[in-house]
Amino acid sequence: MVRVIIKGGVWKNTEDEILKAAISKYGKNQWARISSLLVRKTPKQCKARWYEWLDPSIKKTEWSKEEDEKLLHLAKLMPTQWRTIAPLVGRTANHCLERYQKLLDQAEAQDNQATSSSLGLIGTGEAVPSADDVRRLRPGEIDPDPETKPARPDPIDMDEDEKEMLSEARARLANTQGKKAKRKARERALEQSRRLAMLQKRRELKAAGITIKQKPKKGSVDYNADVPFEKKPLPGFYDTSAETSKSYKAPIGKTLQELNNRNAGPEDATKSKRQREAEEKNKQAKQPIAGPSDEHIRKLKEADQITKRRKLNLPAAQVGQDELEAIVKIGLAGERARFLVQDGSSDATDSLLENYSALDSAKATRTPQLAAHEDSVMREANHLRLISSMQTPLLGDVNVDLQSSKSSGIQTPGSFVPQTPNPLLTPGLRNGQTPASASDSRLHADTSTPQRTPLRDNLGLNVDDSFQAGHETPRELKRARSLAQSHLRQSLSSLPAPKNDFDIVVDEQDVELQANSSSRLDNEPAMSEEDAAERDARLARQAAEEEARSEARRSQVVRRNLPRPAQVDLSRLHNQIDSRYRDRVELLVARETAQLLHHDANVHPIAGGKHPEPEAVQFDTLSDTSLITARELMRKELAEQLGFPGANQEALKRMVAASLNDDEEGMQRLEDALKQQWYEARNNKSQLVEQLEVTRAKMARIASQAAKGEKMLTKVLGGYQARSVALLNSTKEQFKALQEAAISRETFEYLGRGEQCGKADRLDSLRKEVESLARRESMAQTAYKLLAEERSTLQEHCEMLEMELLMRQAESLNEANLSA
């Protein structure tokens, strides 16, 4: 019984590969020829398989939310028109239908789940089968659309039919030659066999003594008689002028194109230009006219799909890099100022200074949780499911109650884009918000996010002007005013109760000021006579105050009894300052310093110095107010340089001491300078002994450092030293080799001069030998010519004798025939 093959069924991986290879060879129009390679598939099935699954332009990725929304919207506008919807969505019609059914099933499942959970209809019986279980194929059923499903993998042991189909397809697809190529090959084989037959025939006739003269072909060459491609030399001597003028230098600095076009002239350039133009015309003529190719269409589809992707739109930077750095510097300066103020302030004023650190506020800042929004895809799918199950309007039934949606019937449902609130955004009204809505939003301030968060206002000093936006009518203004008053009453009612248990602390400066004022009152003429003891005490107090003020007017060096020179030559210092400083400000500062040194050395001399007359010293004495102002300016300048503007004197002392303690090297240099420079020749012997010990300790320390440095350098530079010795030995060997080469060169030069002297004699002898050989060759050529002429004469004579012999034999034969 003949086996009947029913074409169709599940596609296998082997069949897919054969189909793709056949389409690459035969194209997408010869489906009958393509299906002839597949035993179990028809042309229609092959075409459907390609356009539903194997086409590279088919999109098989996961469905995005935008694609789902577009699919549901188009299904509402064009129900059951999947061939029209498919190119708009960018998927195949079958994929669109499957996705549509899946979305409806999901919406129905959610609806059923919500209904059952609300009514509590959960029993112990079997659950209702899902949509996937209903659509899943049962045993014995046949898939109606196998072309849209993935291929079945190949088994390890294939059937004989599949192996035969695969081998036949491989053989047919490997045959890349067409009918014309086969015909040409067949004609070449026939021509070769005909030529061999003719050669065999001539060979046999020649062996039989029959010579057939072959007619030469036109334009052919007889390789037995002629030398192919022979070029006979011209008579005479060869012209070598072209060789002597030819340059044999290496083509250094020239490109390959210059070398190839070295002999090209203007005619060659014109010819190449015409050839390029002809090639361009041929390419344009060979291009297809009937529309773009399939590859071009596929690229356009991919570009269309790429353009449909959502772009990443980020807002522009509201604060630049420079502004961020400035904000950081301001914050650090504020923190330092707060630290300095807290260091010297009292507890009574601590409550007036708030902490505006951005780090603490950033730690507490969190992105607010977004409210759960409804899934628009499921909502639209549920709408379509209800619409599809709705009865005809002729029955008069109630319409389906659809949920409110942002989308109308003519646009795709909008999507919700979650955004992080921006606290740096300028506060104001929303787009399209009316003043009334703005005022209403103020009423619900406890449930909504305010328009602006007051920054750096912990004491509530700034006035909130957010109420003034949008109040245009008198009614709104009155309403806003009443709200502000009620808010103020609530704020005042929340204030703590007043406290009266305060302690009065009197500062010592206030006591001194009070004493000064009392002393000024004492200076006025009194009504009664002053007591002598009180007068003496007042005078002593005034003298002490004047002494304190005089002590304050002295320089820091004198007050602290710091080392200073015993004698100062002011004119010499001025000359050195004028020659060293060019800047006017530095020059003035240096001159003032020299003047102050000279004043201190003369007015407040040290032990061992001279005591000149104070009247000879010219120095402008400043007032107490000027000194206080100058010291305050110095304090501010030093605080700004240290990065702590507004710091007090004690804080500056601590910071300067800390910086000097960190600079150990500078302190060591200062101590060494003080130990070496600030001493007098009249010091006692113990000081010199101490200085000697210090110097010896310094020498020992320097010697140990030098030994360590030498050891370290030996370790570091040992390799370099060994390398230097090796290079020195190599240099000596090379120099020796150079000397030997120079001696060899001189030797060969001497031999060359000797060869130059004997070259002429050898050339003469060789020339004579060549001349004798030439004479002998000419004589031999003459003898050869005579012998060749004699040989030709003898050959002609022999031929004549042979002809005469043949004639006599022919005559004898004729006579014999006649006599017979």
Swiss-Prot record:
Disulfide bonds: none annotated. Involved in pre-mRNA splicing and cell cycle control. Residues 405-423, 431-452 have a biased composition (Polar residues). InterPro entries: CDC5L/Cef1, Cdc5p/Cef1_C, Homeodomain-like_sf, Myb_dom, SANT/Myb, SANT_CDC5L_II. One of its GO terms (cellular component) is post-mRNA release spliceosomal complex. Residues 114-162, 248-294, 405-476, 514-560 are annotated as: Disordered. It is found in: Cytoplasm; Nucleus. Residues 3-58, 59-108 form the HTH myb-type domain. One of its GO terms (molecular function) is DNA binding. The keyword Cytoplasm applies. This is Pre-mRNA-splicing factor CEF1. Associated with the spliceosome. The keyword Transferase does not apply. Keywords: Coiled coil, Cytoplasm, DNA-binding, mRNA processing, mRNA splicing, Nucleus, Repeat, Spliceosome. Pfam families: Myb_Cef (PF11831), Myb_DNA-bind_6 (PF13921). Residues 31-54, 82-104 bind DNA. It comes from Mycosarcoma maydis (Corn smut fungus). Residues 132-155, 268-283, 534-554 have a biased composition (Basic and acidic residues). GO terms for biological process: mRNA cis splicing, via spliceosome; mRNA splicing, via spliceosome. Belongs to the CEF1 family. SUPFAM superfamilies: Homeodomain-like. Residues 160-205, 526-562, 761-805 form a coiled coil. PROSITE patterns: HTH_MYB. Signal peptide: none annotated. SMART domains: SANT (SM00717).
